C-alpha cells in the first residue's frame, strides 16, 4: 500500500508524502489521484472515510461511489436520511468533475439538486451513486448522477454545478 509511484513530474508519491488526501490534487491530475484513492494507495478523503463510502469506478468523466445502508443512517420515518443520500451523490458528482481536471485544479460545489424517487433502507442493499460529467469548462462544470441499487432500481437522481479553482498551497 505504500509502494512508491511516480507522479507526472517524476516524483515519488506515497501515503507518507500525503498526510491529507487533498494534497494529491496539487501534484496529480484528478483521474490519477482518484485512481490512487480507489486502489488504497493514498488516504480516502475524510468525509468518504467517515461515511464509509467506497470508490467503485474511476474513469475520465465517470465515477461511481457505493454505500451499504444501515439503520444508524435512518431518519425518524425509518429510511436513510436524505442528507446522507445527498452527501453520497455530492461526493460522486464532484469526483466525476475532478476526474477531468489537471493537476493544481480543484472543483467545489456551487449548486446541488437531489430528487428522491423512493426510500432507501437497509433492505435495499448496496446503493451506487453513478455520476458523469455533462460539461467541463474553464471556470465551471456540471455533472449528473443516478443512485441505483444492484438490481437497477433508481432511488434518486441529482445534478451539480461546480466552480473550478486553481488550488494554491497555503
Predicted features, each with a name:
Residues 1-170:
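Terminal targeting signals and extreme-terminal segments of soluble enzymes
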Amino acid at each position: 500500500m505504500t509502494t512508491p509511484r511516480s507522479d507526472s513530474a517524476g516524483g515519488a508519491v506515497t501515503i507518507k508524502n500525503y498526510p491529507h488526501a487533498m494534497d494529491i490534487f496539487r501534484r496529480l491530475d484528478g483521474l490519477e489521484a482518484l485512481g490512487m484513492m480507489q486502489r488504497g494507495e493514498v488516504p480516502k478523503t475524510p468525509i468518504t472515510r467517515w461515511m464509509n463510502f467506497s470508490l467503485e469506478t474511476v474513469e475520465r468523466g465517470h465515477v461511481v461511489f457505493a454505500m451499504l445502508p444501515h439503520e444508524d443512517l435512518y431518519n425518524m420515518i425509518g429510511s436513510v436520511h436524505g442528507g446522507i443520500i445527498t452527501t453520497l451523490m455530492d461526493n460522486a458528482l464532484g469526483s466525476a468533475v475532478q476526474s477531468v481536471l489537471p493537476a493544481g485544479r480543484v472543483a467545489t460545489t456551487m449548486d446541488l439538486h437531489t430528487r428522491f424517487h423512493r426510500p432507501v433502507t437497509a433492505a435495499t442493499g448496496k446503493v451506487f451513486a453513478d455520476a458523469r460529467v455533462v460539461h467541463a469548462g474553464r471556470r465551471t462544470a456540471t455533472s449528473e448522477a443516478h443512485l441505483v441499487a444492484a438490481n437497477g432500481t433508481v432511488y434518486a437522481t441529482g445534478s451539480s454545478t461546480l466552480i473550478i479553482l486553481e488550488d494554491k498551497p497555503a
